[in-house]
Swiss-Prot record:
Family indicated by similarity: Belongs to the bacterial ribosomal protein bL25 family. CTC subfamily.
Keyword Ribonucleoprotein (UniProt): yes
Free-text function comment from the UniProt entry: This is one of the proteins that binds to the 5S RNA in the ribosome where it forms part of the central protuberance.
Subunit structure: Part of the 50S ribosomal subunit; part of the 5S rRNA/L5/L18/L25 subcomplex. Contacts the 5S rRNA. Binds to the 5S rRNA independently of L5 and L18.
Protein name per its UniProtKB record: Large ribosomal subunit protein bL25
Organism: Nitratidesulfovibrio vulgaris (strain ATCC 29579 / DSM 644 / CCUG 34227 / NCIMB 8303 / VKM B-1760 / Hildenborough)
PANTHER family the record matches: RIBOSOMAL PROTEIN L25/GLN-TRNA SYNTHETASE, ANTI-CODON-BINDING DOMAIN-CONTAINING PROTEIN, RIBOSOMAL PROTEIN L25_GLN-TRNA SYNTHETASE, ANTI-CODON-BINDING DOMAIN-CONTAINING PROTEIN
Annotated SUPFAM superfamilies: Ribosomal protein L25-like
Phylogenetic lineage: Bacteria, Pseudomonadati, Thermodesulfobacteriota, Desulfovibrionia, Desulfovibrionales
One GO BP annotation of this record: translation
Amino acid sequence: MSEQKTLSVQKRDNLGKGANRRLRSEEVVPGVFYDTKGNNVAVQMPAKPLQKLFEEVGRTTVFQLEIEEEGKKSTHPVLIWDALFHPYKKKFTHIDFFGVDLDREIKIRVPLEFVGTSRGVKLGGKLEVYREFIDVMSKPLTLPKKITLDLTELDINSTIMLKDVAMPEGVRPATNENFAILSVLTPKSE
């Protein structure tokens, strides 16, 4: 397994809308770290290292959050839990980090990646996607970044159900419900 990435942040004392606006004008992103015991710490970090880390780890890869407070540093394994972006500048406006216990399963939403063109679509069928994400249970270090589904063998009137999805080792669906992920539908007649 590759070494985990680290993001350095500082504890933030000035809270509120005005303080957060001042931070953002200085290319600093406000955020909150929620630890495994339910406590939270207001933090701030430079925007560029955060953007770079987010591009590398996304929302399903554990990394180390190094919090500096009054000259002392503490490190915590975390996931990015929620991220808010400016509507058109594609810049972070706020971010939440979720501390994880590496030995306990967590529930997280993982994106699905669809590859290949199905036989049914080549014959004129219509691909209807019902889910682009699925919720899974896994220990934090075995979370997949995405789950890939190969569509090449799907014929017209075929459906991929949750039970048909091959999960990576150590990963299971977060629900017992069996729902449709996608279907190749019969083409409509003119």
